[in-house]
Amino acid sequence: MNKIKSMLSVYFIAGSQDCRHLPGEPTENLLTILQRALEAGITCFQFREKGEQSLACDLQLKRRLALKCLQLCRQFQVPFIVNDDVELALSIQADGIHVGQKDTAVETILRNTRNKPIIGLSINTLAQALANKDRQDIDYFGVGPIFPTNSKADHSPLVGMNFIRQIRQLGIDKPCVAIGGIKEESAAILRRLGADGVAVISAISHSVNIANTVKTLAQK
């Protein structure tokens, strides 16, 4: 459990669709941003190629990009997680898979894997947290969205920062990473409320100084 908690500290999520604000090719922009984030000390990366302007419809290009991201993460010994796409995760031997409440069922993932990957599950209600708190096949909860976010058009209702405290007050000790509209100034507060780490997209992908951003996000 401690290894998972450490992994969640500064959890970067991105796909090419999150890098279109920069000049040049979005896939190359993603690789550049990821390399800088790895050099700065992120503790986990989730490849999330979803939504408008993503490569979701070009499976070959998506796989090639995922492999390049995986190779970068391997160089820095940082876990590489794939968002929902079980087939992709298994074919490139990703370290883990993250799923939402409406995504691929955890049981389906386990039926298709020989060696259990790291599995993360998105949580948006206390009922969901209680229902899954004792499941050994789920390694961590992604809790949110904490704040409004533009990175996901169909996000669940906001839960707010105090939701993390409520989870801990129920005696749930499952590793938790807070997600959704998190900025640098919120990270330390969320940790004090009980989060093991923060997951961000725009805070890093839009940062003008990734090294400083990662350093601030890691502060306790």
Swiss-Prot record:
Checking CDD domains in the record gives:
TMP_TenI
The GO molecular function terms of this record are: magnesium ion binding; thiamine-phosphate diphosphorylase activity
Q: Where are the transmembrane segments?
A: none
Q: In which residues is 4-amino-2-methyl-5-(diphosphooxymethyl)pyrimidine bound?
A: 46-50, 83, 122, 152
The pathway to which it is assigned is: Cofactor biosynthesis; thiamine diphosphate biosynthesis; thiamine phosphate from 4-amino-2-methyl-5-diphosphomethylpyrimidine and 4-methyl-5-(2-phosphoethyl)-thiazole: step 1/1
Keywords of the record, alphabetical order, are:
Magnesium, Metal-binding, Thiamine biosynthesis, Transferase
Annotated residues for binding of 2-[(2R,5Z)-2-carboxy-4-methylthiazol-5(2H)-ylidene]ethyl phosphate: 149-151, 181, 201-202
Any binding details for the cofactor?
Binds 1 Mg(2+) ion per subunit.
Q: Catalysed reaction(s)?
A: 2-[(2R,5Z)-2-carboxy-4-methylthiazol-5(2H)-ylidene]ethyl phosphate + 4-amino-2-methyl-5-(diphosphooxymethyl)pyrimidine + 2 H(+) = thiamine phosphate + CO2 + diphosphate; 2-(2-carboxy-4-methylthiazol-5-yl)ethyl phosphate + 4-amino-2-methyl-5-(diphosphooxymethyl)pyrimidine + 2 H(+) = thiamine phosphate + CO2 + diphosphate; 4-methyl-5-(2-phosphooxyethyl)-thiazole + 4-amino-2-methyl-5-(diphosphooxymethyl)pyrimidine + H(+) = thiamine phosphate + diphosphate
Q: What InterPro entries does the record tag this protein with?
A: Aldolase_TIM, ThiamineP_synth_sf, ThiamineP_synth_TenI, TMP_synthase
Identify which cofactors the protein needs according to its UniProt entry: Mg(2+)
Q: Which residues form the signal peptide?
A: none
EC number(s) for this protein? 2.5.1.3
Q: Which residues bind Mg(2+)?
A: 84, 103
Q: Which processes are annotated in GO (biological process)? A: thiamine biosynthetic process; thiamine diphosphate biosynthetic process
Kindly list the GO CC terms recorded for this protein. cytoplasm
- DNA-binding keyword on record: no
HAMAP family annotated for this entry? TMP_synthase
**Annotated family:** Belongs to the thiamine-phosphate synthase family.
Q: What does this protein do?
A: Condenses 4-methyl-5-(beta-hydroxyethyl)thiazole monophosphate (THZ-P) and 2-methyl-4-amino-5-hydroxymethyl pyrimidine pyrophosphate (HMP-PP) to form thiamine monophosphate (TMP).
Query: What is the recorded name of this protein?
Result: Thiamine-phosphate synthase
